[in-house]
Design a protein with these regions (language model features):
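His/Glu-based metal-binding/catalytic segments typifying zinc-dependent metallopeptidases
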Residues: 147, 164, 233-294
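Short solvent-exposed loop/turn micro-motifs enriched in small/polar/acidic residues
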Residues: 15-18, 243-245
């Protein structure tokens, strides 16, 4: 169980695959997708709900992630902990994760156990039972998770502060795991109310992948998910960001930091919102600007100037409401962070002024495609890409058309995207520095 931080690297590669899925809907509104993959006698079930941390009420940060934990605590027919014990007993694996726009649950098991995992997951869609006896101890588990993963990690603390600075009004600015003071106040009643409000078949997508058939999946989906009644689910109405007129800067010093690092994160359009014409060029821009040892930033700052140990760029366009574009660099031991920042700013300005060669753009597109082809072989790649698309405003058709749209990107479009997004007033610069022990 985990809160999910969107990774530009994970989903940039995953979404490029073509999975040839087949889909249908049940009468209660549940969308079902089947991705046949007969390479091994394995089946995977993923259930994606269109609800995440950005759908929480003010003062209840962390509730979506907390509820994810609580779905393993028993139903009217399954005792606390029995869900995962059953999956383990049949030789399978299960887990779940939460992000700003979704909560997802998955199991992987032998293909002949598909009915077992579908029966278990369908049961907790509508039969969850929560009492203080299980909720309050699990709240302590989440509090400890926050302490260990965020409060004891300087890098995680910095990321949290960056998001708070980047989003002036939108709930993407609060942590998925929640603020410590608000987690402490979450109750059994909060969790049950959130569950009843958002966990419904008409607010979910079921994805089955592996050594399965559409006919069998349809039969099992009708048997176990079909009887669950639909509910009225609230519209996802969220506050918008005001115009960003001033660059922001976050500096964190900590005795546990060994080497300094510098990064800058820009607010950007996403696949679902904003200037969507820029999203595919932004994927290519991230690759050509900072996607590896042949990229411009690495070549200029690490190889030619020799002042950095690493440098790169990334794009995360998966948000329902906003995306992000980032650049980063770390100095060599003993290097000066201000010198590094000046060099990065110079290289970004030079890239926008000079543009990119068509050969560089073509190489970047080929690298993205090669990564995508490799990612497609995994059984989880398709469910990840399609599930995330469903919860964040895209369609199966968008996922399937991804390689073609990347291939069509031109150098002119990449430059237009760079000029539109790499605006310092819409950015947060973050610096992580060592601090001498007192």
């Amino acid at each position: 169980m985990a809160f999910f931080a969107c990774s530009p690297f994970l989903f940039t590669t995953v979404q490029a695959a073509v999975f040839s899925p087949q889909s249908f809907s049940l009468d209660n509104g549940l969308k079902v997708v089947v991705i046949e993959n007969h390479r091994a006698p394995i089946a995977m079930q993923m259930l994606w709900y269109r609800v995440g941390a950005a759908d929480e009420e003010a003062g209840e940060s962390g509730l979506a992630h907390f509820l994810e934990h609580l779905l393993f605590k028993g139903t009217k027919t399954i005792k606390p902990g029995e869900f995962s014990r059953t999956i383990s007993r049949i030789g399978g694996r299960d887990n779940a994760f939460t992000s700003y726009d979704f909560t997802a649950y998955f199991q992987r098991a032998a293909a002949h156990e598909l009915e077992t995992i579908m029966r278990l997951e369908a049961d907790r869609m509508h039969n969850l039972v929560l009492t203080d006896e299980v909720v309050l101890p699990e709240r302590d588990v989440v509090l400890e998770e926050r302490r260990s993963r965020t409060d004891n990690s300087p890098a995680a603390q910095l990321r949290e502060q960056v998001r708070r600075a980047l989003y002036l009004n939108h709930p993407y600015g609060r942590p998925v795991i929640g603020w410590m003071s608000e987690i402490k106040k979450l109750t059994t009643e909060n969790a049950l109310a959130f569950y009843r409000k958002h966990y419904a078949p008409n607010n979910a997508m079921l994805i089955i992948a592996g050594d399965v058939s559409v006919e069998n999946v349809r039969m099992l989906a009708e048997k176990y998910y079909g009887p669950i009644p639909s509910r009225v689910v609230p519209a996802r109405v969220r506050p918008k960001e005001p115009p960003h007129r001033a660059a922001r800067r976050v500096v964190l010093k900590n005795v546990r930091v060994r080497l300094p690092s510098w990064s800058r994160t820009y607010l950007a359009p996403s696949y679902a919102a904003g200037e969507k014409r820029h999203v595919y060029p932004l994927e290519v821009l991230a690759q050509v600007l900072g996607g590896g040892s042949t990229s411009r930033l690495y070549r200029k700052l690490v190889v030619e100037r020799g002042i950095a140990s690493s440098a790169g760029a990334w794009y995360s366009g998966d948000g329902l409401d906003y995306g992000e574009f980032g650049v980063y660099v770390s100095p060599k031991a003993g290097g000066d962070i201000q010198v590094l920042e000046n060099a990065m700013v110079e290289e970004l300005a030079a890239a926008i002024k000079e543009g990119f060669q068509p050969a560089d753009i073509d190489r970047a597109k080929k690298l993205i495609s090669a990564q995508a082809i490799y990612a497609r072989d995994g059984i989880r790649a398709g469910p990840n890409a399609i599930g995330q698309a469903f919860t964040q405003g895209q369609t199966i058709e968008d996922v399937e058309a991804w390689p073609e749209r990347i291939s069509a990107v031109t150098p002119e479009q990449v430059m237009a995207a760079a000029k539109a997004v790499l605006i310092v007033e819409s950015s947060v610069t973050s610096i992580l520095l060592p601090e001498a022990a007192k």
